[in-house]
């Protein structure tokens, strides 16, 4: 009897140990739909969205890449061979693409994927205040960035997921939040400390290849990838510095590696490479708005001014009107229509618009806080006044006619164009497929909506 009890106890201990080892082993295995080939230098979060529909599995693929701060003329200036080759084999904008105002990173990245001007999708700056919420948004605040209630519109990844198509988004602004009821099936969390490391650069390519190697029911058909260079170098050293030129060629080499990797998959992939804005050498010291007006009664975020009193708005507007020539001041409702920046209270009121590459802010830091001069390179300006703000556009693939060039166009028009290539029905947007329809093999037939209703 004692021997039997000892046997049972031994069996139980062995079984528990075996189960623990098995559980540990299972935890290290990829979940269904995952790949064991993902590069851990850029961890991906997997959301359990429904598999690709039969309709989605028949569609082509689009890989959208953004090179932050890659000015419209960098490729030709620095002989970026891979980007120029992409343009020769497909389409490009030799004179650049027009960013939306303000020509800043978060507003324009979200414009590219929603087709909405910043005043309509809500990201009116990289950082701003919302009077209705009595809260601030900042691109450096993880809590705000991952809160989908800040964003309006249906980004391409939400559009795809809502119509039965998987998407994978690698570091694109806005992709860490649930927006329009969806998250991308795959996404990566942004880590400013590591995202530009050589390991993270290689991981982008490795993970795209691994994603495209998934089974058809799991494979994403829309992939978006964000790179922070050459924006950093442009800010720190200026757009014409040797360091910036080196970063331009570095990113061109990354595009070359990505293109070669995509070609090896044998899939029908349209590769689209854009930037969010350009870069210009800043002129002069900070322009502090409180040097020209008494901002008592105002909150401020950067150059954006917020007051609860209409009397304060009128007073400061009249004071700023008499100011120096480096900016023009408007009441919010009177901001010129061509800027598409006169409807959203998040933009502040009054609104100061720089007339050149001048660094504007409400006021210097409070006493005791460190102040810094403006960065050597800057952006955020109206491209009509500062043409260096123009962005880049290159694309090639089975849906794109070769040897095409396009005149400068507004970046809101990318959204319906990419949606068309994926056969998606676009959400309401400020763009038009007609602008880029002539670059498509099918000439944009059967759109503005979509070529066939997904089922």
Task: Kindly give the residue locations of the regions a language model identified.
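Active-site nucleophile/metal-coordination loop of metallo-enzymes that catalyze phosphate/sulfate
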Residues: 34-59, 72-162, 178
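A long, amphipathic alpha-helix that forms part
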Residues: 44, 55-57, 198-213, 230-271, ...
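His/Asp/Glu-rich, glycine-adjacent segments
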Residues: 116-238
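Polar, surface-exposed loop/tail segments
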Residues: 321-323, 329-347, 424-453
């Amino acid at each position: 009897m004692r021997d039997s009890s000892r046997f049972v106890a031994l069996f139980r201990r062995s079984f528990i140990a075996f189960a623990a080892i098995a559980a540990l082993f299972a935890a290290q295995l990829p979940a269904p739909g995952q790949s064991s080939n993902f590069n851990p230098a850029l961890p991906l979060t997997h959301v359990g969205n429904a598999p690709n529909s039969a309709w989605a599995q028949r569609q082509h693929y689009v890989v959208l890449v953004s090179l932050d701060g890659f000015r419209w003329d960098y490729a030709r200036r620095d002989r970026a061979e891979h980007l120029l080759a992409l343009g020769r084999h497909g389409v490009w904008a030799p004179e650049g693409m027009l960013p939306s105002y303000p020509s800043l990173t978060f507003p324009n990245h979200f414009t590219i994927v929603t087709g909405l001007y910043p005043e309509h999708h809500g990201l009116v700056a990289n950082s701003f205040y919302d009077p209705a919420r009595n809260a601030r948004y900042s691109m450096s605040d993880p809590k705000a960035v991952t809160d989908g209630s800040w964003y309006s519109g249906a980004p391409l990844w939400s559009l795809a997921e809502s119509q039965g198509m998987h998407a994978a988004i690698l570091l694109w602004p806005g992709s860490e939040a649930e927006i329009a009821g969806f998250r991308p099936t795959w996404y990566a969390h942004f880590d400013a400390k590591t995202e530009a490391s050589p390991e993270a650069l290689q991981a982008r390519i490795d993970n795209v290849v691994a994603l495209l190697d998934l089974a058809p029911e799991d494979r994403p058909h829309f992939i978006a990838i964000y790179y922070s260079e050459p924006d950093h170098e442009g800010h720190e050293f200026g757009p014409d510095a040797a360091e910036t030129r080196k970063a331009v060629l570095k990113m061109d080499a990354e595009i070359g590696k990505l293109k070669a990797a995509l070609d090896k998959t044998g899939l029908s992939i349209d590769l689209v490479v854009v930037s969010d804005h350009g870069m210009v050498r800043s002129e002069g010291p900070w322009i502090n708005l409180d040097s020209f007006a008494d901002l008592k009664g105002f909150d401020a975020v950067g150059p954006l001014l917020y007051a609860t009193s209409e009397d304060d708005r009128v007073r400061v507007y009249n004071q700023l009107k008499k100011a120096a020539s480096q900016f023009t001041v408007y009441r919010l409702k009177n901001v010129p229509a061509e800027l598409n920046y006169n409807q959203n209270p998040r933009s502040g009121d009054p609104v100061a618009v720089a007339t050149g590459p001048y660094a504007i802010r409400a006021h210097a830091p409070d006493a005791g806080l460190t102040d810094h001069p403006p960065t050597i390179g800057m952006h955020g300006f109206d491209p009509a006044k500062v043409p260096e703000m123009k962005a880049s556009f290159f694309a090639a693939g089975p849906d794109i006619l070769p040897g095409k060039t396009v005149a400068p166009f507004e970046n809101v028009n990318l959204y319906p164009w990419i949606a068309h290539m994926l056969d998606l029905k676009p959400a309401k947007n400020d763009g038009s497929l007609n602008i880029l329809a002539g670059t498509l093999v099918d000439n944009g037939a059967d759109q503005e909506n979509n070529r066939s209703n997904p089922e």
